[in-house]
């Protein structure tokens, strides 16, 4: 065919060889902060009990160790599967370390677009992937300004059942619990 090929200028050229121009770029554009994930040197069950008894959180999902202790707890005061997640790390330098802050996107397509934007801007990320716990899709990246780990998060499920029974996970199930 005789046709002129569109050539992008150096400023608008994509790093993706099969795409002429960079992705439309007004940032990843999250809708809201979704949740925070904390690491703690305190036993997770102790932390989770405090959040339930003193703060009114509901336990949604948890990881139980063979000795009955919790290694992780996903909790919320809203219909979200979690507003906060708490994980036990005996080597955490304090009782409360931010593991990540999660931002919500509308759908999986927005998550894939976010991956393109991060790649175009030279920001290293992990994902996209899917968590078994929470049934959500994710990308993890480090905020180059603050050094804080961010999760770009979508899907998941909402809980409207007043008699919700927390989902128990074991260490043997972490190959699908954390990511697949």
Place the predicted regions along the sequence by residue.
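A short beta-turn/loop motif at secondary-structure boundaries
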Residues: 65-67, 92-93, 130-134
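Generic beta-strand/beta-sheet core signal
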Residues: 62, 76-78, 87-89, 106, ...
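Flexible internal linker/loop segments at domain or repeat junctions
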Residues: 78-98
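Vicinal oxygen chelate
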Residues: 1-29, 31-42, 73-74, 93-119, 122-180
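Core segments of cupin and vicinal oxygen chelate
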Residues: 39-81
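Histidine-centered active-site/metal-ligand motif
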Residues: 35, 82-84, 100, 131-133
């Amino acid at each position: 065919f005789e046709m002129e090929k569109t050539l992008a200028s150096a400023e608008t050229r994509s790093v993706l060889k099969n795409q002429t121009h960079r992705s439309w770029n007004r940032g990843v554009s999250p809708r809201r902060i979704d949740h925070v994930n904390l690491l703690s040197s305190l036993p997770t069950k102790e932390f989770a009990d405090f959040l339930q008894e003193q703060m009114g959180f509901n336990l949604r999902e948890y990881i139980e160790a063979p000795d009955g202790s919790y290694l992780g707890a996903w909790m919320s005061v809203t219909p979200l599967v979690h507003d906060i997640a708490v994980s036990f790390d005996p080597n955490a330098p304090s009782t409360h370390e931010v593991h990540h802050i999660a931002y919500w996107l509308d759908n999986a397509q927005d998550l894939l677009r976010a991956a393109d934007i991060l790649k175009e801007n030279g920001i290293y990320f992990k994902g996209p992937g899917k968590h078994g716990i929470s049934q959500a899709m994710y990308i993890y990246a480090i905020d180059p300004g603050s050094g804080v780990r961010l999760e770009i998060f979508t899907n998941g499920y909402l809980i409207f059942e007043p008699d919700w029974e927390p989902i128990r996970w074991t260490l043997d199930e972490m190959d699908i619990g954390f990511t697949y």
